[in-house]
Amino acid sequence: MALLEDIINFATLNPMVVVAIPVFLFVISLLRSYLRLAHIPGPFAAGWTNLPRFSWVLSFKAHDIHTALHRKYGPLVRFGPNMVSVGDPKEVGHIYGFTDPWMKSDFYHALLMKPRGKPIPGIFAAQDENIHRALKKPISSAYSMSTLLSFEPYVDSTMRVFCEQLESRFIENKKPLDFGKWLQMFAFDVIGELTFSRRLGFLESGEDINHVMANIWETFKKTSLVTQMPWLDKLWTNNPIQRWRRGGGASPGAAFAMARVEERRELQRTTNKNDWHFNTRDFLSRFMEAEAKDPSIPPYALAAWASSNITAGSDTTGIFLRTIFYQLLTHPETLRKLREELDQAAAAGNLDDLASWKQTRELPYLDAVIKEGGRIHPPFGLPYERVVPAQGATICGKFLPGGTLVGMSAWVVHRNKELYGEDCDEWNPDRWLKCDTEKRRKMENALLTFGAGHRTCMGKHIAYLEMYKVVPTLLRKYDVSRLLCFLVSRTG
């Protein structure tokens, strides 16, 4: 007690001590943080602060910078004081496996819906495994491939509208078009059909309805930065002013989906029915059925499910489609090979003008093109972060203490030369065909296009259903090799 009084008296008589003590403690804390992962190579500044990785994302070149850093430093690279990026494909199962899953980091907090500032868990961003399980279990069957095949007529309907709009707006008038924009609008209208039994109106209007696409992009630009320094969320993206600008705090995609949910609830109240006479039950009908059957489902679940479909289901598919057509346009030999395969299948009576899922699954070169599209330009450009369990873990031969943040970037893993070859930076669908079964299995298992393990994106089958149908259909109908000028019909 006397010693404590002496220290207090000394500090009172020496004001500099009051300043020096917290500075000293801060420096000690900083040193401990740095030394904790000093055995992991990486940029010097990244050992002291998260500002470098924040700046990489700010540059819009984080995916390329991450790849370059791994080629310089090896399979483990320190991205921050407590963050290690892993680039070895063999570690995918270790970090993202189905057994003993590692918890998601605070990276995902920035991706949560926050109506009125309060975060609402979603299937993708939920950190608590119990919450994730409670949200996923009631609706997981709706995302199975067998169930999604019952949705194929919805995709067909939107594809017909897509083709009609291309022909009336551009082919007949020989006008140039922004094909990437139209592929994105197609993806939005498909997910609208699947989720709400109606297109969202992008294709018919030829416009970004309510600026949803632009607003989602702006939101992603901000949240991607905040994921690197999660404490910024309340200061920047979720402060009262931003919540007011968003009309109560919901992100653009979430607000759009929640409005559609309220429309359906109002229809249910006024008609007093659970069946709105749709030919096929859409996602929202299935979500509401699940909610009605299980009173334990939290009240926010319906909005979380619907908004996930709109926000994630449209953007990732749009990116994927743009990638494939860009690569086909810039690699004429690939386009020629794929068109040849499609024409031969059609001549044999095995491919309709409106391609079906069953038919396209028998086309190996199309399969290779789509796999290569997901490999060379995965939609998600940042590492999928996880927290090392309390006991620590050995990754790539080095021990990482419990609580360390680790993550694998699809861009880094997909450019692993040992697995994908010296030409891994190049577009080459043949890599999936000119290899043995074991090599192909390893390459497929390392694909992180839609994540990995038990937290793999539930909507990946939706994306594949669209791609395996729309790519061959458009290539059969139109000469896309002339897209740099204008789109023309292949039939005259």
UniProtKB/Swiss-Prot annotation:
GO BP term, example: secondary metabolite biosynthetic process
Enzyme nomenclature, EC number: 1.-.-.-
Biotechnology: Azasperpyranones display potential anti-cancer activities. Azasperpyranones A, C, D, and F exhibit potent growth-inhibitory activity against the A549, HepG2, HCT-116, and HL-60 cell lines, with IC(50) values of 2.39-14.42 mm, respectively. Moreover, azasperpyranone D significantly inhibits HCT-116 xenograft tumor growth in BALB/c-nu mice. In addition, azasperpyranones A and C can bind with four kinds of therapeutic targets for cancer, eEF2K, FGFR, survivin, and TNF-a.
Induction cue: Expression is induced by the azasperpyranone cluster A-specific transcription factor ATEG_03638 which is itself regulated by the azasperpyranone transcriptional regulator ATEG_07667.
Record flagged with keyword Ribosomal protein: no
Disrupted gene: phenotype observed: Abolishes the production of azasperpyranone A.
Residues annotated to bind heme: 457
Molecular function, one GO term: iron ion binding
Main localization of the protein described in the UniProt heading: membrane
Top-tier EC class: oxidoreductase
PANTHER family membership: CYTOCHROME P450, CYTOCHROME P450 MONOOXYGENASE APDB-RELATED
Family: Belongs to the cytochrome P450 family.
Function: Cytochrome P450 monooxygenase; part of the cluster A that mediates the biosynthesis of azasperpyranones, members of the azaphilone family that exhibit anti-cancer activities. Azasperpyranones are synthesized by 2 clusters, A and B. Cluster A is responsible for the production of the polyhydric phenol moiety while the azaphilonoid scaffold is produced by the cluster B. The non-reducing polyketide synthase ATEG_03629 produces 5-methyl orsellinic acid, which is then reduced to 5-methyl orsellinic aldehyde by the NRPS-like protein ATEG_03630.
Protein name: Cytochrome P450 monooxygenase ATEG_03631
Organism: Aspergillus terreus (strain NIH 2624 / FGSC A1156)
UniProt lineage: Eukaryota, Fungi, Dikarya, Ascomycota, Pezizomycotina
